[in-house]
Amino acid sequence: MPKLKTRKAAAKRFRQTGTGKFTRRKANRNHLLEHKSTARKNKLSHMAIVDERDEERVSLMLPYL
């Protein structure tokens, strides 16, 4: 059986925690930051956990994580 391929785009965007969950960056912190409050930008800088309904799709894209 051939080796499974990793989706490289997903590999750059997701990391796996020690418990097997996936983390992701939050959106809206790339540009147009001038009008956003400091508190909002700080909250957006933290990593988020991928929703459980999306975990299966992410794990299929990353077979070796």
UniProtKB/Swiss-Prot annotation:
GO cellular component entries: cytosolic large ribosomal subunit
Region (Disordered): 1-28
Domain of life of the organism encoding this protein: Bacteria
InterPro entries the UniProt entry points to: Ribosomal_bL35, Ribosomal_bL35-like, Ribosomal_bL35_CS, Ribosomal_bL35_sf
Swiss-Prot/TrEMBL keywords: Ribonucleoprotein, Ribosomal protein
Keyword Disulfide bond: no
Keyword Ribosomal protein in record: yes
Compositionally biased region (Basic residues): 1-15
Biological process annotations from GO: translation
Molecular function terms from GO: structural constituent of ribosome
PANTHER family: 54S RIBOSOMAL PROTEIN BL35M, LARGE RIBOSOMAL SUBUNIT PROTEIN BL35M
Family designation: Belongs to the bacterial ribosomal protein bL35 family.
Matches recorded under HAMAP family: Ribosomal_bL35
Identification of the protein by name: Large ribosomal subunit protein bL35
Species this protein is from: Cyanothece sp. (strain PCC 7425 / ATCC 29141)
Gene name of the record: rpmI
